Swiss-Prot record:
Family: Belongs to the Orn/Lys/Arg decarboxylase class-II family. SpeA subfamily.
HAMAP family assigned to the protein according to its UniProt record, in alphabetical order: SpeA
Native source species: Aeromonas salmonicida (strain A449)
Protein name stated in the entry: Biosynthetic arginine decarboxylase
InterPro entries noted in UniProt: Ala_racemase/Decarboxylase_C, Arg_decarb_HB, Arg_decarbox_C, Arg_decrbxlase, De-COase2_CS, De-COase2_N, Orn/DAP/Arg_de-COase, PLP-binding_barrel
Length: 633
């Protein structure tokens, strides 16, 4: 263990596999980020960014955004599809469309929209009226593509049609049969020719947590018969030329490339059949699904993906290209809506640990000779454990059973508090000793070794709300890479479980990337008593902010963009302070002015002097204007 280095920590946290080349650990044991792939030697030490923010008055938790990572991800996506098009001889174009539901923050949309400005090959997708109004205002270039998905009313459709007058290329994707008539009515009323798309309900499905997005039971999309009816309706009105886009979506975060291959093949058949029917489809939108390898395991796990970005692009381009070559069809423009893959890496939540409860050996002596037999039996098990060739599993099972009997007898009044405490400490010592003696290589020991690793892990209390900042970790068991930001040049001699500061037992992180797998505890170095430990939650740039809730009235955290300047130095900009207590109370219709009035009335009690009244009111005002999370004094 004395030869431990940062390279060892890199392997434990599996950074090279989930970090996509952006994150690293330097020789000093500090986590770094290289956000700009065109300048790989320009690194930012994340803890330095936190210290600079602290000096300006911002305490953790803080969400750090790296706009250069967004730009790098856009470049990577275009490069992957560009290379696939070139290698396959595909004769159509590729268009990246960002679905803003993934992260609707204005700065995120602006950065993505402006990161590929050589020609309008980067569009936006909206799934609701508010999102549509947002994307109509964000796109400034003539001919910018906007894809309109989701359920629609007439107002939504009117906004989409009017977007064409603003110079955009707006596709209205019909997701249920009744939407077509509304599109036709509103387009006639406004005298604007609609660009219509249709979402096909594929039989193919993707496996994973979002597999219900595909298949015959999908919430969205038209069946084969409904698509035929739509085609005939447009043909009868001599408006078949309005149907220009074919769309499908297998679901978010597809882990298995074979699911994507199956969906592309089925979509290709829909494209060829629509062309055979005389429909001038010239755009195929393959939707989302491009996975992010949160675990770094390159597997079919729900939080991983067994393929690379280039492999995904190759399968999409070759799959559609094969259909075009087979049936001598024109090559459509390919659209992908890869929002998660674009945004996940760009955001890191950083917070501090405010305390920890460790499990240590207790100094305990043998029970008195007249102690109850149950306690004598427990002590004998402890002695057996320290003898020659102990039966480890049997000793553990006996200790667990004995402790259960102790609790029962204590409740019945047969044991006193001191005896119960003695039994708990002895059982804890037994577990600690067993943990060191078990051999995980031994299959018979493996389950107990895992159980004790979790049972004896430190409880680490982190200054954040899981429900606000990592809602998918709580709601669907999503895995996010987590690691301390400093001290990683030291041996990872501790195991911890991160718990948030909400009053909810669900508020803890249950899954941690550990090597090429996922464990229930987090490897951590030993920190000195006065040493601040910052922890980073990585790949949180997709969905987490907008899905977060206000459990215990913990709101949005502080946020800042961390960029590279022209010299490759750190440049912090666009700092947004998190919710104050005053703002959070207003969210739930509690009027702070009423609180102030009530305080004024309460402190007017004659038993309080003027100085005390003023102190109470001053503290109230500081509290209302303060950060909802724990702050340094």
């Amino acid at each position: 263990m004395t030869n431990w280095s940062s390279k060892d920590s890199l392997k434990v946290y599996n950074v090279p596999y989930w970090g996509a080349g952006f994150f690293n650990i330097n020789d000093a044991g500090h986590v770094t980020v290289a956000p700009d792939k065109s300048r790989p030697d320009a690194h930012i030490v994340i803890s330095d960014a936190i210290e600079q923010l602290r000096q300006s008055g911002l305490t953790t938790p803080v969400l750090l955004r790296f706009p250069d990572i967004l730009k790098s991800r856009v470049d990577a996506l275009f490069n992957a599809f560009g290379q696939a098009i070139e290698k396959s001889g595909y004769e159509g174009d590729y268009l990246c469309v960002y679905p803003i539901k993934v992260n609707q923050q204005s700065r995120v949309i602006e950065t993505i929209s402006q990161s590929y400005s050589d020609k309008p090959r980067l569009g936006l997708e909206a799934g609701s009226k508010p999102e549509l109004l947002a994307v109509l205002s964000h796109h400034h270039e003539q001919g910018s593509v906007i894809v309109c998905n989701g359920y629609k009313d007439r107002e939504y459709i009117r906004h989409a049609l009017l977007g064409n007058l603003m110079g955009h290329k707006v596709y209205i994707v019909v997701e249920k049969p009744s939407e077509l008539e509304m599109v036709l009515d509103e387009s006639a009323r406004l005298n604007i020719k609609p660009n219509i798309g249709v979402r096909a309900k594929l039989a193919s499905t993707g496996s994973g947590m979002w597999e219900s997005s595909g298949g015959s039971m999908s919430k969205f999309g038209l069946s084969a018969s409904q698509i035929l009816a739509l085609v005939e309706r447009l043909r009868s009105l001599d408006k078949l030329d309005c149907l220009q886009l074919l769309h499908f979506h297998l679901g978010s975060q597809i882990a298995n490339i074979r699911d994507i291959q199956g969906g592309i093949r089925e979509c290709g058949r829909f494209y060829s059949e629509l062309r055979r029917l005389g429909v001038p489809i010239d755009v195929v939108d393959v939707g989302g699904g491009l996975g992010v390898d949160y675990e770094g395991t390159r597997s079919q796990s729900h939080c991983s993906a067994n393929y690379s970005l280039s492999e995904y692009a190759n399968n999409v381009v070759w799959g559609i290209g094969d259909v075009c070559r087979e049936f001598d069809l024109p090559y459509p423009t390919i659209i992908s809506e890869s929002g998660r893959a674009l945004t996940a890496h760009h955001a890191v939540l950083v917070t501090n640990l405010i305390g920890a409860e460790g499990v240590e050996m207790s100094d305990i002596s043998a029970p008195d000779e007249d102690a109850p037999t149950l306690l004598q039996n427990m002590w004998q098990g402890w002695l057996d454990l320290r003898g020659e060739d102990p039966s480890l599993l049997e000793i553990f099972h006996d200790s667990v059973a004995d402790l259960g009997d102790v609790n029962t007898q204590y409740t019945m009044g047969l044991l006193n508090l001191e005896q119960r405490a003695w039994a708990e400490m002895l059982h804890q010592n037994t577990c600690l000793a067993l943990k060191e003696m078990l051999n995980p290589v031994n299959r018979n020991h493996r389950a107990l070794a895992d159980e004790l690793s979790e049972k004896l892990a430190d409880k680490c209390f982190a200054n954040f709300s899981l429900f606000q900042s990592l809602p998918d970790a709580w709601g669907i068991g999503q895995v996010f890479p987590v690691m301390p930001l400093t001290g990683l040049d030291r041996p990872l001699s501790r195991r911890g479980i991160l718990m948030d500061i909400t009053c909810d037992s669900d508020g803890q992180v249950e899954h941690y990337v550990d090597g090429l797998g996922v464990e229930s505890t987090l490897p951590m170095p030993q920190y000195e008593e006065n040493e601040v430990c910052y922890v980073g939650f990585f790949l949180v740039g997709a969905y987490q902010e907008i899905l977060g809730d206000l459990h215990n009235l913990f709101g949005d955290t502080h946020c800042a963009e961390v960029c590279l300047d022209e010299e490759g130095k750190m440049d912090i900009r666009n700092v947004v302070r998190g919710d104050t207590v005053d703002q959070l109370l207003r969210y739930v219709n509690i009027d702070p002015s009423v609180i102030r009035e009530n305080y004024q009335r309460i402190v007017s009690h004659p038993a309080l002097d003027d100085a005390t009244r003023k102190a109470l009111l001053d503290e109230l005002e500081l509290g209302l204007q303060g950060y909802a999370y724990l702050e340094d004094e």
